[in-house]
């Protein structure tokens, strides 16, 4: 990295890091109630997390509030 960005920082203390994104093997997010009364899932969006955030959040709020989501989600 130093050869591409000389003088950009102190590389001596640098370490490798990866910001992994949770996703399911099928690439379909998990949104819905679980067998645990106080646990609701809205995860597994992978690289589309920000893209799907508003729609998934709204669907999650509807489901938690026992309302039918506006959009039909086949993966709920």
Question: What name fits each language-model region?
Answer:
Residues 2-76:
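C-terminal catalytic lobe of FAD-dependent flavoproteins
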């Amino acid at each position: 990295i130093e050869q591409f960005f000389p003088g950009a920082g102190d590389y001596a203390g640098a370490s490798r890091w990866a910001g992994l994104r949770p996703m399911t093997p099928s690439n379909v997010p998990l949104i819905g109630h679980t067998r645990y009364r106080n646990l609701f899932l809205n995860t597994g969006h992978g690289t589309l997390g920000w893209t799907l955030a508003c729609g998934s959040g709204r669907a999650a709020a509807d489901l938690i509030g026992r309302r039918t989501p506006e959009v039909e989600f086949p993966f709920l």
